[in-house]
């Protein structure tokens, strides 16, 4: 049985990973660690695990020693050195943070304020968006799990950019997320009286997911792609919906667009291209690893509008990481991820 460990197990992403992994039939949990709750039993931190596990938060070295696959669910800047140790021990590392998502060190320094601490390791890392990078993921031992916003946007735009059907510049990405995307640490923006009955953008023009979106979309299009990305906080726990505006190079109808998308994703079980006339929504993907995509035309402005919906904690984080693990280990891609969204 494959042993799996989590470094940073008590943040929202880490604990969501653990919740899903406990229902995975092909693995068992080797060990978990948490700086904030070192030495404490998980059941005393999160009561929803009562009766399911007696795991105790231990130190990072024990997690690496007892695990074959290690998920690092840490703030940016903390994973590189740990990943090096994991790889040196011939283990698999799936990093949930931003440390390995960008290939350009100058770009990383501009957005995150640091240089790469392990530049050679970046050459070994693979961007873990399975629907677009599956073959590389299969043979990788270091995965950069994509950001939540980039996942929703990249899946939505990939078919059009891959087929050179839209202008690569001037793409507008208007995204809304539940507050779990901000993590478990307290902040004024996610304080209940501030967020409840409110809806507002944040980090306008300076969100750190912007360079990730542009780099991956540029790779898909084989030309430089630029976007205007504006995130917003919704007064809900989980979910992302992205509304994306782009300009076709030539006039194209909805039926043609639908055929392109259904063909592009025909073998991808987690991406659902909705029938024409339907609109993607958070409710229908909540608590699942699915991405729902719908598209629409603004005939007056000759504009394609794409709607993409995911659960930010699952397809945007923990579920996608498990999907990557399944691919690397040769498991069924949906192992542990056969999740159906609740109807209400």
From Swiss-Prot:
Compartment annotation: Cytoplasm
Subcellular location, principal: cytoplasm
EC number: 1.2.1.38
Active site: residue positions: 148
Pathway: Amino-acid biosynthesis; L-arginine biosynthesis; N(2)-acetyl-L-ornithine from L-glutamate: step 3/4
Family: Belongs to the NAGSA dehydrogenase family. Type 1 subfamily.
Xref: HAMAP family: ArgC_type1
Name used for this protein in its record: N-acetyl-gamma-glutamyl-phosphate reductase
Organism the protein comes from: Clostridium botulinum (strain Eklund 17B / Type B)
Encoding gene (name): argC
